[in-house]
Amino acid sequence: MQLEISPRQRSQQQKEEEGEHQQRAGEEAVGAVFSIEPWVDAAAVLVPPLNFAEVNDGIFRSGFPAADNFAFLLSLKLRSIVYLCPEPYPEENTRFLEQNGIKLHQFGIDGSKELLVNIPEEKIREALKVILDVRNQPVLIHCKRGKHRTGCVVGCLRKLQKWCLTSVFDEYQHFAAAKARSTDQRFMELFDTSSLMHLTASQC
């Protein structure tokens, strides 16, 4: 024998089912909010990395980007990052690049403070080839603080742009400040640009 459900009971049952559905939807919505990466927030404040600056159209420099800089990096519409440290890229930063289609080019240069350390000229040269390839732009160049390794790469780029050494050194010292190294400036002075002169003026 099948019991009939009265209209009142049916109405109460529907209300309970609707309540459970709304509760599940609310829980899913809350879960979705917490799963969103912080850089996706449209209301996020744009905070540039330490020592950030525009070098040229489509070329930028900075210190190491932290998570609170990611929204700012998105605003640059980067295609590539040139990373000048030998240490592995942090997992959080790697995930950010992967999820936003940004390619990482790593040229590990030792950040030793020893005055007699040799700066690897070939790595600087290869980094410049990547930076000046318009297919990789917009591109961000960075090391740890955006001072020495980044400063050397940008200084060598300026030589390609025919800057005089005084201007090259002034820019380097602006970012390095009290930490400026004579060895860095000597390296930039002696850097041979002849093998890179085939790069077009528009790339520089």
From Swiss-Prot:
Q: What class of enzyme is it?
A: hydrolase
Using the chain's own numbering, where are the disulfide bonds?
A: none
Annotated region (WPD loop important for active site topology), positions in chain = 107-119
Instruction: Tell me which Pfam families the record gives.
Output: Y_phosphatase2
Q: Which GO terms describe its cellular component?
A: cytoplasm; nucleus
> Where is the site described as Transition state stabilizer found in this chain?
R149
Stretches of Basic and acidic residues bias are at 13-27
Per its UniProt record, what InterPro entries does this chain match? PFA-DSPs, Prot-tyrosine_phosphatase-like, Siw14-like, Tyr_Pase_AS, TYR_PHOSPHATASE_DUAL_dom
Q: What does this protein do?
A: Cleaves the beta-phosphate at the 5-position of soluble inositol pyrophosphates. Has highest activity on 5-diphosphoinositol 1,2,3,4,6-pentakisphosphate (5-InsP(7)). Acts as a negative regulator of defense responses against the fungal pathogen Magnaporthe oryzae.
The similarity comment for this entry is: Belongs to the protein-tyrosine phosphatase family. Atypical dual-specificity phosphatase Siw14-like subfamily.
Protein name, entry field: Inositol diphosphatase DSP2
Q: Report the source organism.
A: Oryza sativa subsp. japonica
Instruction: Identify the gene encoding this protein.
Output: DSP2
